[in-house]
């Protein structure tokens, strides 16, 4: 399953929208990343703190699983709690659990997309819980091909950024259309991560397959952001 990255202003707007499942964390979703800071209890955080002294917070992990059997979506929607199914709008059952807080999109083919995990372990645990729910409804569901497709992170550099200057100097990688989307879209090549950079200093990173790519991308962009700091 392919997950398109937000590389245009309209895609970025959709990505940051309140109703977006890809980035479901923003209280002021339209134009700025969340203020949430990294959980100091996360063992990964201290060892990933680079030159910037800032560690992006993981906001959403998107994973896919193959349950390896055909599913009757009407039956699932009828008997499972916190499940909705409106085939005219979307060809999957949308199911939610509270612990770990997440959302699953369950397709008749047996393919499942799980969103909302804040860590790789949470994502896998949630995916297993959904598979177990399907099994309890009488389907011969297995848990195969678990794969993390996208990791979304965010952080705040705590200083304003001159987006026009950044877009001009890094035109090959940047797209900035403030009348369509308030952030600059920066397409990093290595690691292959897309960054949404806001004038306030808030940053959203997406497209990573492993959390290290989020950290690497931020450390790579930080000197550039410092260069275009508004004084």
Curated annotation (Swiss-Prot):
The protein in question is named TATA-box-binding protein
Entry keyword annotation includes Protease: no
| Signal peptide location | none
What protein family is recorded?
Belongs to the TBP family.
The principal location of this protein is: nucleus
GO cellular component, as recorded:
nucleus; RNA polymerase I transcription regulator complex; transcription factor TFIID complex; transcription factor TFIIIB complex
Subunit field text: Belongs to the TFIID complex together with the TBP-associated factors (TAFs). Binds DNA as monomer.
* GO BP: any one term: transcription initiation at RNA polymerase I promoter
Q: Where in the cell is it found?
A: Nucleus
Q: Which Gene3D superfamilies does the record associate with it?
A: TATA-Binding Protein
Origin superkingdom: Eukaryota
Job description of the protein: General transcription factor that functions at the core of the DNA-binding multiprotein factor TFIID. Binding of TFIID to the TATA box is the initial transcriptional step of the pre-initiation complex (PIC), playing a role in the activation of eukaryotic genes transcribed by RNA polymerase II.
Q: Give the UniProt keywords, A-Z.
A: DNA-binding, Nucleus, Repeat, Transcription
Organism in which the protein naturally occurs:
Schizosaccharomyces pombe (strain 972 / ATCC 24843) (Fission yeast)
Q: Which CDD domains match?
A: TBP_eukaryotes
| Repeat (sequence) residue spans along the chain | 58-134, 148-225
């Amino acid at each position: 399953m392919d997950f398109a990255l937000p590389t245009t202003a309209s895609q970025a707007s959709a990505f940051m929208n309140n109703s977006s499942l890809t980035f479901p964390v923003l209280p002021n979703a339209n134009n700025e990343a969340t203020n949430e800071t990294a959980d100091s209890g996360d063992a990964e955080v201290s060892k990933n703190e680079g030159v910037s002294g800032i560690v992006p917070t993981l906001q959403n992990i998107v994973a896919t699983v193959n349950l390896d059997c055909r599913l009757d979506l009407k039956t699932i929607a009828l008997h499972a709690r916190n499940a909705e199914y409106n085939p005219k709008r979307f060809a999957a059952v949308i199911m939610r659990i509270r612990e770990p807080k997440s959302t699953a999109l369950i397709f008749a083919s047996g393919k499942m997309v799980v969103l909302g995990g804040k860590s790789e372990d949470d994502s896998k645990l949630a995916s297993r819980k959904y598979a177990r729910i399907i099994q309890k409804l009488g389907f011969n569901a297995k848990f195969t091909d678990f794969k993390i497709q996208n990791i979304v992170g965010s952080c705040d550099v705590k200083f304003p950024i001159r987006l026009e200057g950044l877009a001009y100097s890094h035109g090959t990688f940047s797209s900035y259309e403030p009348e369509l989307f308030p952030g600059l879209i920066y397409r990093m090549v290595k690691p292959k991560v897309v960054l949404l950079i806001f004038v306030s200093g808030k940053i959203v990173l997406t497209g990573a397959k492993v959390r290290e790519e989020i950290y690497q991308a931020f450390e790579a962009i930080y000197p550039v952001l410092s260069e275009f700091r508004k004084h």
